[in-house]
């Protein structure tokens, strides 16, 4: 039974960050309270009806490998699945799924309701409760105190949220939901650095008024991909297509004529928006020579009448939005059933956070999601999981955990945020990861599931399946190394005839698989192949490990060199003013950031190689003193 006032961890906000945080904490055995304005909006897809994409899907796979629920939720609600960059190397291939918004929310709700140690309540938090520079609970609008050892703030766009449509604006966390004004005001009174960002969404269109004839159709890939390592294609609901249309010169002219009604271009809206998901107004202004822009028509669900026109996010007045939509092929007679809008909200400087996402200033207070300056469901969910597990560890007075840049995209994300900070909404891309060949989608479980098991995040069924996969991979890779093909065998003739491969000496199946034109299924047609495995996931892993073995080895060696700096810790340095030779600018930055290692210090803007050398010399001298 719960003591209804005392918990180990309290999570404020039940979007993608909040729900993953609450799940992680409760799975680790902590009594967890999840507070939300509306239980009916648990894990809601507030903007686009999709999960995954370039770089983002890697985060989803990592969440899954650590026992999180996003991959499972999209497997049970995805109505179109595709592999992006399928013609490129495995490092940048990314899964993307269209979601049925209602099914997604219902799946998240079902998972949360089955979770032990978790209580979900409807309440708006207006204040935090502090004791000796530590957070010890929250105060709700109806004056109820809830106490805990750790608090995770995952308030999304609700802190100081303001919606803009044309030159009109009003306070809201998202359309139809009120802003958390009191909590925003209270947090601004603390010594936390806060600023404003904005994001936007397109109008929603009645599917019954769209003319899909003559539009490019986009179906699911075959075979249909699966997100979760525990998933199966049978989990997917019915698959339906999306459609592609384009803006045109008429569309662009309508927008140009109405820029004086845009809150972005009239100065009403100050916050910076996402660089890689600009409004249609931004596209027209920034790319004046473009004759058209893509618009993907994405159904919001199997039973929904809403279509999400991906590519025309806008905050222009509703009457202008109607003109824009009517100018686009297939949408000439379409009816808008919800206007597009921009929303401006508070975010807190992530440089004020440790790599565990705990505040450097307030013990026990963790931040996750859009309030850290990120954009996207996947970025939010991955931060939520990390904040939740560390809030749980903190409540047990146990040292926190975070992945390194060479271990996970989540490691890249939190290192970028806490080391570099951000002035615009941060979106994950594969290009942000310097070790992306080692951080592929297919090996997320091999990188993280054992860690998740030690942390208490991975249940028995996932652990058993993971170990079976590892055994299958190891057994098959050893078999392929031992299985040889003779140059005088019938298989040699097949290789010459079908693949123009001439054998001059005996070759192993493993060596053969290294060749670019050979796939695992090609080996299965050879007489000497004998019995292989049928696990497609393991087969993909085997192919990638064998084909890219040389590149992976070189990257592993690079990681080893990199780890020397990551494992050279700076915790012994309390005041950088005392180190001779550092410039005043470097001293200020090091004292402000408080990097945990030489590696992290080297990634801070303005920290020069000369400064790193001085730090290394200082550490060597200090180490020598301690040996005397």
UniProtKB/Swiss-Prot annotation:
Cofactor(s) needed for function: FAD
Compartment(s) where it occurs, according to its Swiss-Prot or TrEMBL record: Cytoplasm
Name this polypeptide is given: tRNA uridine 5-carboxymethylaminomethyl modification enzyme MnmG
HAMAP family listed in its UniProt record: MnmG_GidA
Positions of NAD(+) binding: 273-287
Keywords: Cytoplasm, FAD, Flavoprotein, NAD, tRNA processing
Any single biological process term in GO: tRNA wobble uridine modification
Entry-linked InterPro entries: FAD/NAD-bd_sf (IPR036188), GIDA_C_N (IPR049312), MnmG (IPR004416), MnmG-rel (IPR002218), MnmG-rel_CS (IPR020595), MnmG_C (IPR026904), MnmG_C_subdom (IPR047001), MnmG_C_subdom_sf (IPR044920)
UniProt record similarity statement: Belongs to the MnmG family.
Annotated SUPFAM superfamilies: FAD/NAD(P)-binding domain
Subunit-structure text: Homodimer. Heterotetramer of two MnmE and two MnmG subunits.
Described function: NAD-binding protein involved in the addition of a carboxymethylaminomethyl (cmnm) group at the wobble position (U34) of certain tRNAs, forming tRNA-cmnm(5)s(2)U34.
Cellular component, GO annotation: cytosol
Entry GO MF terms: flavin adenine dinucleotide binding
Source taxon at top rank: Bacteria
Keyword Nucleus belongs to the record: no
Binding site for FAD: 13-18
């Amino acid at each position: 039974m719960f003591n209804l006032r005392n918990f180990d961890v309290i999570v404020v906000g039940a979007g993608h960050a909040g729900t993953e945080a609450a799940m992680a904490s409760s799975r680790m055995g902590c009594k967890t309270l999840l507070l939300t304005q509306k239980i009916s909006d648990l894990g809601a897809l507030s903007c686009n009806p999709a999960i995954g994409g370039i770089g983002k899907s890697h985060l989803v796979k990592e969440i899954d490998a650590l026992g999180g629920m996003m991959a499972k939720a999209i497997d049970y609600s995805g109505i179109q699945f595709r592999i992006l960059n399928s013609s490129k190397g495995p490092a940048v291939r990314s899964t993307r799924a269209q979601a049925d918004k209602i099914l997604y929310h219902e799946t998240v709700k079902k998972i949360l309701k089955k979770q032990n140690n978790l209580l979900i309540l409807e309440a708006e938090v207006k204040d935090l409760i502090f004791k000796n520079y530590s957070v010890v609970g929250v105060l709700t609008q109806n004056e109820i105190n809830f106490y805990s050892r750790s608090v995770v703030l995952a308030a999304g766009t609700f802190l100081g949220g303001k919606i803009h449509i044309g030159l009109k604006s009003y306070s809201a966390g998202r359309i139809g939901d009120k802003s958390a004004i009191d909590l925003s005001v209270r947090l601004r009174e603390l010594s936390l650095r806060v600023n404003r960002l904005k994001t936007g969404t397109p109008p929603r269109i009645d599917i019954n008024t769209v003319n899909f004839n003559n539009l490019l159709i986009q179906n699911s890939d075959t075979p249909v991909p699966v997100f979760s390592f525990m998933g199966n294609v049978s989990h997917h609901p019915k698959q339906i297509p999306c459609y592609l249309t384009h803006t045109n010169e008429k569309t662009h002219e309508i927008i140009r004529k109405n820029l004086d009604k845009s809150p972005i271009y009239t100065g009403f809206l100050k916050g910076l928006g996402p660089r890689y998901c600009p409004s249609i107004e931004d596209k027209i202004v920034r790319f004046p020579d473009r004759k058209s822009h893509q618009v993907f028509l994405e159904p919001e669900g199997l039973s929904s009448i809403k279509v999400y026109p991906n590519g025309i996010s806008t905050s222009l007045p509703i009457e202008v939005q109607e003109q824009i939509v009517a100018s686009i092929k297939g949408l000439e007679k379409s009816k808008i059933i919800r206007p597009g809008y921009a929303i401006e909200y508070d975010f807190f400087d992530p440089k004020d956070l440790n790599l565990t996402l705990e505040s450097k200033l307030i013990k026990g207070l963790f931040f996750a999601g859009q309030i850290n300056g990120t954009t996207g469901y996947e970025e939010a969910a991955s931060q939520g999981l990390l904040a939740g597990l560390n809030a749980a560890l903190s409540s047990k007075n146990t040292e926190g955990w975070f992945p390194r840049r060479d271990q996970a995209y989540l490691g890249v994300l939190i290192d970028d945020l806490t080391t570099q900070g951000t002035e615009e909404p941060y979106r994950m891309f594969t290009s942000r990861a310097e070790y992306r060949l080692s951080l592929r989608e297919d090996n997320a479980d091999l990188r993280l599931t054992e860690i998740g098991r030690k942390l208490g995040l991975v249940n028995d069924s996932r652990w058993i399946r993971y170990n079976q996969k590892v055994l299958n991979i190891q057994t098959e890779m050893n078999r392929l190394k031992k299985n040889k093909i003779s140059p005088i065998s019938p298989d040699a003739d097949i290789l010459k005839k079908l693949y123009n491969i001439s054998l001059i000496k005996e070759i192993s199946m493993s060596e053969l698989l290294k060749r670019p034109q050979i796939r695992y299924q090609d080996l299965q047609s050879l007489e000497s192949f004998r019995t292989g495995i049928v696990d497609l996931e393991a087969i993909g892993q085997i192919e990638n490990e064998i084909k890219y073995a040389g590149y992976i080895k070189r990257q592993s060696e690079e990681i080893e060199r990199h780890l020397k700096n990551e494992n050279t810790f700076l915790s012994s340095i309390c005041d950088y003013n005392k180190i001779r030779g550092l410039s005043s600018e470097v001293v200020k930055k090091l004292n402000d950031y408080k990097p945990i290692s030489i590696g992290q210090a080297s990634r801070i803007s303005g920290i020069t190689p000369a400064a790193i050398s001085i730090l290394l010399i200082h550490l060597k001298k200090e180490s020598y003193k301690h040996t005397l």
